[in-house]
Amino acid sequence: MNDIMGEYTNKGLTGLTNLGNTCYINSSLQIMSHVYELNEYITHFFSKEHQKNDTNIIFLKEWNDLHKLMWSKNCIISPNRFIGVIQKMAKQKQNDIFAGFHQNDSTEFVYFIISIFHDALKGASDVDTLFQCQLNDFEHQGISSKSDFVRYLKTYHKNNYSIMDTLFGIYCKMDIVDSSSSKVLSSKYENFYMLDIALTSTSLDECLKIHFANELMNKENDNQYYDDKEKCYKDVIKKYSIYYPPRYFIVQLKRWNHNLRKNQRIIHYDINSIDLNPFCVIFK
């Protein structure tokens, strides 16, 4: 990583011209442009792989060309061509919110572009090696290769893994625990590329604490858990945690309510001291 960082020092200070209301796209592209491992991987992909006539790969190629231009020298670029490619891809994927020049949410666009990159790269020749490296890393962290989590991964990622999962994949676990016996009644894993966080505080740390706080499901709260095995309602504790954190942790702050009103509060955080350890199973 240090070698890669050295190659990028004092470069990539390139601005993208706003074409209509594309500022949300430009900010998203700047973020993706600075994920160095990803762009190194994409460049290597196009230098080694036999390319298929696939719309996702064509989109990725257009991004690779724009990224190279952005890092060739520090300048201002008008990304007309790539905006056109985005609009065409949005129509093909029936995602019309990105098919025009209207203002949209940047996090939705980040997810849109990550999904396209994933679809383009899941057929790369080194995918099996990437996935095995991920499994090896899990084992190094003390997660058994025979665990329920690894079985979940192998099922979910069968023919569906890419470098995007290595870099951005967030794996979470939900446990339902009997309040009286502390017995785990059920467990469920899930994964995604970004975590939706409700704006319950002006502090990101507090928002995370509330998001991952235990939830009491009991008679008093009128939300008891129904145990299918014993055919009865029980008082339980619902525990939600990050089972394995990603290299790049994307948080979406849910600013819009059901009445389409935006929460404009400023959220405070220290980029150098955000600690996910209290919310991660493997670090508890």
Regions found by a protein language model. Name each.
Residues 1-284:
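UBL (ubiquitin/ubiquitin-like) substrate-recognition surfaces
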